[in-house]
């Protein structure tokens, strides 16, 4: 094991013992904020230290087996123990490296998923609708809840833009690598010559702020406009100015919400989306900085990157970041995203491990 890794683990072991002692003190238990913080740290360190202690035990057993080699009667048993121990040490080293990888603090958060039609006009809007259905179907499989926050329907179906909130355990950790450009190649229903058209949509996956106050928003930086919600023919159309548009002046970010009949609820929802977008900008900047040092294409933070192509005539989906091609487009469009998402997570973890090894 590398010295830097061993030092890190020895410090973690010492810290866990400190935490055990602290958590046993009545005055610590009386301070709920402090107690919660310490128990969270204890829960994070326990699995790592547990593996480290197993590792130290195997090391000690190896030393004993090494000494047994001098005894002719015990040599065969000692050699078998040394072989088993060497394999177990390699296994534990790999597990420890993975356990030490930095955790994304947003992984367990709910998300706002934003899909925008790009090049391709009506066909792009229709594809935005297909993407929303794909993510909704995936969310249903995970037993997550999906609610539309804001929508701007396309002329012939689909969406020019749609924002949904997805509520569920690990939503951000599973879908965070979906941000970027999604390109579709297919023959539109309106195409009489059977020609393949290419169009695109942009997806942004943003972790929901635990509360709006978590993101520093100066009220003086906001322009808030109200207007009447629009509705399709025959639908209820508000007679009051219930729709809300919030403009964040320093960044130019604009959020509109008009899906609720209550101006108050629309305003609260718009503020939540704005907070998520501002938080997302911070994450993008951080990811771009990290990506430039680790040369990783996954989670680079660049929303303009084309990340995936959906080729319907060939039944093919290609993720360009990891050169993965799957010939199961119908299943994927019906929410079968597991194989894609697992491959992206594995590649991201491999990049993190490479960085950790480089530091060592």
From Swiss-Prot:
Any one Gene Ontology molecular-function term assigned to this protein's record: translation release factor activity, codon specific
Coiled-coil ranges from the UniProt annotation: none
Record's comment on post-translational modification: Methylated by PrmC. Methylation increases the termination efficiency of RF1.
Biased composition (Polar residues): 285-295
Membrane-spanning segments: none
Region feature (Disordered): 285-305
Protein name: Peptide chain release factor 1
Species classification: Bacteria, Pseudomonadati, Pseudomonadota, Betaproteobacteria, Nitrosomonadales
